[in-house]
A protein has these predicted regions:
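Membrane-interface extramembranous regions
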Residues: 1-127
């Protein structure tokens, strides 16, 4: 279980960190694939990008450093909240092609949070 959780943490940690960075550094040609991103208010745009970066890093760094490992399940729980917001945003706009991805990402984040909170907590110096 520990190895499976680590694989999920690294994959989703990298994914969310990259997606969060894209909120700030938008590559050319992205508008066609992620046009919805341009419709967010600037404040919400930066908040969601920052949350994704911090939570993505929070899935990986505490476990590697063994410092504040309790942050990993909290990062997973935070990503669940971000994905609930994304689900609502896309559903209200009728962008149902994005809703499935939000559900998968939210479910995986919830599993990581539960797994690192109850099933296989990370060992750490913080207890």
């Amino acid at each position: 279980m520990n190895m499976f959780l680590w694989i999920l943490q690294v994959l989703f940690g990298i994914y969310f960190t990259v997606v969060g960075v894209i909120h700030f550094v938008v590559p050319s040609g992205l508008h066609a694939a992620m046009g919805w991103m341009y419709d967010l208010s600037p404040g919400l745009h930066y908040i969601s990008g920052t949350a994704e970066i911090l939570a993505g890093l929070g899935l990986i760094i505490p476990g590697i450093t063994k410092i504040q490992t309790r942050l990993t399940p909290l990062a997973g729980a935070g990503l669940v909240l971000v994905m609930i917001g994304a689900f609502v945003w896309h559903a209200q706009r009728g962008e149902f092609q994005n809703v499935g991805l939000n559900l998968v990402l939210g479910a995986a984040s919830a599993f990581i949070a539960y797994g690192r909170w109850k099933l296989q907590p990370l060992p750490g110096r913080d207890g």
